[in-house]
């Protein structure tokens, strides 16, 4: 099982394996960061377009799920539990990816989030205030999806991803 895990990590670009010598964690390049954020923007935009085109009741259901996740994020941050916050952040974005009604894009979105977490995990560090800024942006994103305001969503998403990238 360990060998298979290492092979998977190598295929995903996280490790470089050296037979009979060991493994090396592949450093994160500026190009990888750029490509992950660019791909996230494309996938997220597509999902938001699909959600904003849905009937009000369907959009409201997705927004309700997002609001519930935001409430959990607030609770986690009130307790300075950044580990829980990180998982809830992933859930928030996955709800949007799943709402795009394309399982391939939702899977790609999940993979991109995992790659992004590789370089953002240390960026938030122990900074609850920084995490609260992201939660405030989540509120704006959820509100834009609830009302079907794609322009507001995309503007906030651009700020959200730019702020995340600038933390690196």
Each language-model region and where it sits:
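Short acidic-aromatic low-complexity motifs
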Residues: 145-148
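Conserved amphipathic alpha-helical segments that form helical-bundle/coiled-coil interaction surfaces
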Residues: 36, 58-121, 136-140, 152-162
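Hydrophobic alpha-helical segments typical of transmembrane helices
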Residues: 1, 32, 92, 130, ...
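Short, charged helix-to-loop "capping" segments that act as catalytic/coupling loops
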Residues: 51-65, 125-129
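Short, flexible turn/loop "capping" segments at secondary-structure junctions
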Residues: 17-18, 89, 133-134
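Short linear motifs at protein or domain termini
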Residues: 1-53, 104, 165-166
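Short alpha-helical transmembrane interface motifs in multi-pass membrane proteins
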Residues: 29-30, 121-124
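Mobile beta-alpha loop/short-helix "lid" or hinge segments that flank ligand
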Residues: 11-16, 110-115, 129-132
């Amino acid at each position: 099982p360990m060998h298979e895990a290492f092979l998977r990590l190598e295929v995903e670009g996280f490790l470089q394996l050296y037979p009979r010598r060991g493994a090396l964690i592949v450093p994160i390049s500026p190009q990888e960061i750029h490509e992950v954020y660019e791909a996230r923007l494309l996938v997220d935009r597509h999902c938001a377009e699909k959600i904003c085109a849905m009937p009000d009741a369907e959009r409201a259901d997705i927004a309700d799920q997002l609001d519930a996740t935001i409430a959990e994020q607030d609770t986690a941050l009130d307790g300075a539990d950044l580990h829980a916050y990180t998982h809830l952040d992933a859930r928030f974005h996955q709800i949007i990816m799943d709402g795009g009604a394309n399982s391939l894009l939702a899977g790609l979105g999940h993979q991109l989030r995992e790659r992004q977490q590789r370089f953002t995990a240390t960026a938030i560090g122990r900074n609850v205030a920084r995490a609260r800024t992201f939660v405030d942006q989540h509120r704006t994103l959820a509100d834009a999806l609830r009302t079907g305001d794609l322009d507001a969503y995309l503007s906030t998403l651009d700020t959200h991803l730019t702020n995340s990238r600038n933390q690196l």
